[in-house]
Amino acid sequence: MGVTKKPDLNDPVLRAKLAKGMGHNYYGEPAWPNDLLYIFPVVILGTIACNVGLAVLEPSMIGEPADPFATPLEILPEWYFFPVFQILRTVPNKLLGVLLMVSVPLGLLTVPFLENVNKFQNPFRRPVATTVFLIGTAVALWLGIGATLPIEKSLTLGLFQID
């Protein structure tokens, strides 16, 4: 925890500066003109120069050209949709699959309320939140890895056979 220096309002020098309107920059460096005129343009122009330089030096295609007459056997979404895709793929009832898919963001909306149950920040002193996080992470990884496998091996990750 940092130490905050509080100004002594009984100091006559500080009172004179506050009377002149100089109190807000008394502790630190002003943003105008140092940051706004010198540092920000360098950062912005440097970022633009890096992007243009990479585009000129390494002009690569964005993906492969599409072939409208050849559809792949297994269409996979982007990697961050793998767990939800796996839920839709393995649940036989479509309505139940959609309800489970909707429950993912609804469950994430409950996280702030679960976090505020305990005032401690140490994860070892918040066992409920830590357990929910670890189980959720394990399930998301399990579903995400399973989405990349064929449907027969997706639930067991190919580790054992279910007959």
Swiss-Prot record:
GO terms of molecular function: electron transporter, transferring electrons within cytochrome b6/f complex of photosystem II activity; electron transporter, transferring electrons within the cyclic electron transport pathway of photosynthesis activity; oxidoreductase activity
Gene3D superfamilies the record matches: plastocyanin oxidoreductase (1.10.287.980), Single helix bin (1.20.5.510)
Principal place of residence: plastid
Keyword field contains Transport: yes
GO CC, any one term: chloroplast thylakoid membrane
GO biological process: photosynthetic electron transport chain
Segments traversing the membrane: 36-56, 95-115, 131-151
Pfam families: Cytochrom_B_C
Record key words, sorted: Chloroplast, Electron transport, Membrane, Photosynthesis, Plastid, Thylakoid, Transmembrane, Transmembrane helix, Transport
NCBIfam families: cytb6_f_IV
Assembly, per entry: The 4 large subunits of the cytochrome b6-f complex are cytochrome b6, subunit IV (17 kDa polypeptide, petD), cytochrome f and the Rieske protein, while the 4 small subunits are petG, petL, petM and petN. The complex functions as a dimer.
Name used for this protein in its record: Cytochrome b6-f complex subunit 4
Species: Phalaenopsis aphrodite subsp. formosana (Moth orchid)
Native organism taxonomy: Eukaryota, Viridiplantae, Streptophyta, Embryophyta, Tracheophyta
